Amino acid sequence: MDSNHSAPAIVITVINDCASLWHEVLLGIEEEGIPFLLQHHPAGDIVDSAWQAARSSPLLVGIACDRHSLVVHYKNLPASAPLFTLMHHQDSQAQRNTGNNAARLVKGIPFRDLHA
């Protein structure tokens, strides 16, 4: 088993200490009642980091973010094919809905429209 975290949580890899830029995404995950675990890395490819986070998450969902973009990945997808990619300039509602959708993937319920 690839998972190395015992508590069920979405694993979020934060590259270059940028978690505060993506606060709305974290709030979206919290709104859905799913825990998350932040792990900090000084550098890395965002898509690969998200896939590695998904592989290490007991919930099979991983996120990686840097100062420019955020990627949501699922362990059962190909490494090069993330589920969602969000750019930092997108509005706070799109960020919140992306967090909701990452959590909804765990729950197995329909996604929200990113721009609704």
Swiss-Prot record:
- Which GO MF terms are attached to this record? hydrolase activity; metal ion binding
Induction (record text): BMC production is induced by growth on 1,2-PD vitamin B12 medium.
The free-text function statement in the UniProt record for this protein reads: Small subunit of the propanediol dehydratase-reactivating factor (DDR), which reactivates suicidally inhibited adenosylcobalamin-dependent propanediol dehydratase (diol dehydratase, DDH) found in the bacterial microcompartment (BMC) dedicated to 1,2-propanediol (1,2-PD) degradation. Reactivates inactivated DDH in the presence of ATP, Mg(2+) and free adenosylcobalamin (AdoCbl), by mediating the exchange of the tightly bound damaged cofactor AdoCbl for a free intact one. The 1,2-PD-specific bacterial microcompartment (BMC) concentrates low levels of 1,2-PD catabolic enzymes, concentrates volatile reaction intermediates thus enhancing pathway flux and keeps the level of toxic, mutagenic propionaldehyde low.
Protein's recorded name? Propanediol dehydratase-reactivating factor small subunit
Q: Do the record's keywords include Chaperone?
A: yes
Q: Which residues form a coiled coil?
A: none
Gene Ontology cellular-component terms listed: propanediol degradation polyhedral organelle
Where on this chain does Mg(2+) bind?
A: 31
Q: What's the catalysed reaction?
A: ATP + H2O = ADP + phosphate + H(+)
Q: How does it assemble?
A: Forms a heterotetramer PduG(2)/PduH(2).
Could you say which protein family the record assigns here?
Belongs to the DdrB/PduH family.
Biological process terms in GO annotation: propanediol catabolic process
Q: Which InterPro entries match?
A: B12-dep_deHydtase_bsu (IPR010254), Dehydtase/Dehydtase_re (IPR003208), Diol/glycerol_deHydtase_re_ssu (IPR009192)
- Give the free-text miscellaneous remark of the entry: Bacterial microcompartments (BMC) 100-200 nm in cross section are formed during aerobic growth on minimal 1,2-PD-B12 or anaerobic growth on 1,2-PD-tetrathionate medium, but not during aerobic growth on glucose, anerobic growth on glucose or pyruvate-tetrathionate. BMCs can constitute up to 10% of total cell protein.
